[in-house]
Swiss-Prot record:
Disulfide bonds: none annotated. This is Nitrate transporter. Its main location: membrane. SUPFAM superfamilies: MFS general substrate transporter. GO terms for molecular function: high-affinity secondary active nitrite transmembrane transporter activity; nitrate transmembrane transporter activity; nitrite transmembrane transporter activity; voltage-gated channel activity. Residues 1-34, 93-100, 152-161, 220-306, 379-389, 439-507 are cytoplasmic. Induction: Subject to nitrate and nitrite induction, and nitrogen metabolite repression. CrnA expression is mediated by the products of nirA, areA, and niaD. Pfam families: MFS_1. It comes from Emericella nidulans (strain FGSC A4 / ATCC 38163 / CBS 112.46 / NRRL 194 / M139). It comes from the Eukaryota.
């Protein structure tokens, strides 16, 4: 099918798990397209609000509240700390209640402190407010778990990375949106600066609530309906299959069931691909195969012991710790990049350096999906998660090399600085996408816990690296090469860890 048509056509669906095999990016009228849209759009608005303070904090809010540089740094760290805690909690909540309801809950709860920004009158009040607004950063977890539930493993890396990349771009968009709203309120409404910045935060509040209501009334929990009934479909479909009314996996004949997702296509069984012949299966054998395939990917509500084993398994740590380096570096560098540019190129001015710094976040639109796309491409060619693992290791090592080069050279040339930053952005953000392409393979029955753990480690890395920058005394180049050394060492040290535990079901 033509690529342009894939973006708008109803997706083909795997009959074993009802997950889409393509991403209808431009088709919000389709169930899968609508879920994908709200996944990235809701996360983008959350990210926009989460990062809405730095663009106005540099001058306006700082002067109005008489904040010191230390208090500004503390507010940045506190915002990351809140998100770390929320992401760790969100994982089990997604497995228990489903990602859609968790997503909606986080948006609505996080919108309240966003609307209360106008009540802040002191630095301490702003720090406390940013802690609660940090709740919105936790929406990353349900965003990824929701996408994983609707898109097949052959395409889930692209879906997850594209949703996250578009969402992360909110961190760059806010550098343009919030100053534009602020300037408009002063110019067109005649508000003084100390009132205009407070009123400006009503806009993200309205957008966040609208997105949450859209999810609530127009989207489904899973491809088969309610989250609480996700296992019922598996049992009913298996019973139906045992009677012969199933999708014929070898011939592509469609089920006689009157309802179901559109465009369901058949999956070729491995023997067909290897031998070039089709081997009909007995209905009972097909039923068992479908049951095993669905059960292996169905998210359960793990017991406390099972959750503990998942969290501290080597396979989980092998994706969580690298994400602490890649996404943690992104968060930390985002917070200092404008100041770093201003330090090395003072003649550019605050506005111009801020716009160039925003481009680091904007590149997520292309770079993060690129990592997921490459990982999916290699997986389809090799049919082994090791392909994704090797790609991840390569991206992580090169990412570290770029940070080391940038830190030791401390460029004074605009071309060199922006070139190294763009190269770093590609490998760093592609690395983020590749990691969440691999996450669905690790303990798929506890995908929420794994996603929450990995997402939480990303914020933990951001906090640690932000502290490194804070105590580097504005020697940003030194802080960047330290991040590069740490990242390279981590990616090399976990490169040997199996991407999927031996005890896990077939891959």
């Amino acid at each position: 099918m033509d690529f342009a048509k894939l973006l708008v056509a109803s997706p083909e669906v795997n009959p074993n798990n009802r997950k889409a095999l393509t991403i209808p990016v431009l088709n919000p009228f389709n169930t899968y397209g609508r879920v994908f849209f709200f996944s990235w759009f809701g996360f983008m608005l959350a990210f926009l609000s989460w990062y809405a303070f730095p663009p106005l904090l540099t001058v306006t809010i700082r002067d109005d509240l008489d904040m010191s540089q230390t208090q500004i740094a503390n507010s940045n760290i506190i915002a990351l700390l809140a998100t770390l805690l929320v992401r760790l909690i969100c994982g089990p909540l997604c497995d228990r209640f489903g990602p859609r309801l968790v997503f909606i809950g986080l948006l609505l709860v996080g919108s309240i402190p966003t609307a209360m920004a106008g009540l802040v009158t002191s630095p301490q009040g702003l720090i406390a407010l940013r802690f609660f607004i940090g709740i919105l950063g936790g929406t990353f977890v349900p965003c990824q778990v929701w996408c994983t539930g609707f898109f097949d493993k052959s395409i889930v890396g692209t879906a997850n990375s594209l949703a996250a990349g578009l969402g992360n771009a909110g961190g760059g968009i806010t550098y343009f949106v919030m100053p534009a709203i602020f300037d408009s309120l002063i110019r067109d409404q005649g508000l003084p600066a100390h009132k205009a910045w407070r009123v400006a935060y009503i806009v993200p509040f309205i957008l966040i609530v609208a997105a949450a209501l859209g999810m609530l009334f127009t989207c489904d929990d899973t491809p088969t309906g309610k989250w609480s009934e996700r296992h019922i479909w598996m049992k009913e479909d298996t019973q139906t299959a045992s009677k012969g009314n199933i999708v014929d996996l070898s011939s592509g004949a469609q089920s006689s069931r009157p309802s179901g997702p559109p465009s369901i296509i058949a999956y070729a069984i491995p023997d067909v691909e290897k031998k070039g012949t089709e081997t009909p299966l007995e209905p009972q054998s097909q039923a068992i195969g479908q049951f095993d395939a669905f059960r292996a990917n169905a998210v359960a509500s793990p017991s406390r012991k099972e959750a503990f084993n998942v969290i501290f398994s080597l396979a989980t740590m092998a994706v969580a710790v690298p994400y602490a380096c890649s996404f943690g570096s992104e968060l930390a560098i985002n917070s200092i990049l404008g100041d770093y540019y201003d330090k090395n190129f003072p003649y550019m001015g605050q506005t111009q350096t801020g716009k160039w710094a925003a481009m680091f976040g904007f590149l997520n639109i292309v770079c993060r999906p690129a990592g997921g796309f490459l990982a999916d491409f290699l997986y389809r060619k090799t049919n082994t998660p090791w392909a994704k693992k090797l790609l991840l290791s390569f991206l992580g090592v090169v990412m570290g090399a770029f940070m080391i080069a940038m830190g030791f050279s401390d460029p004074k040339s605009e071309a060199t600085m922006f070139g190294l930053t763009a190269g770093l952005a590609f490998f760093l953000e592609s690395c983020n996408g590749a990691i969440f392409s691999l996450v669905p393979h690790v303990h798929p029955y506890a995908n929420g816990i794994v996603s929450g753990m990995v997402g939480g480690f990303g914020n933990l890395g951001g906090i640690i690296f932000a502290i490194i920058f804070r105590y580097s005394h504005h020697d940003y180049a030194r802080g960047i090469w330290i991040l590069g050394v740490i990242s390279m060492a981590v990616f090399i040290s976990v490169s040997w860890v199996r991407p999927v535990p031996k005890s896990q079901m077939r891959e």
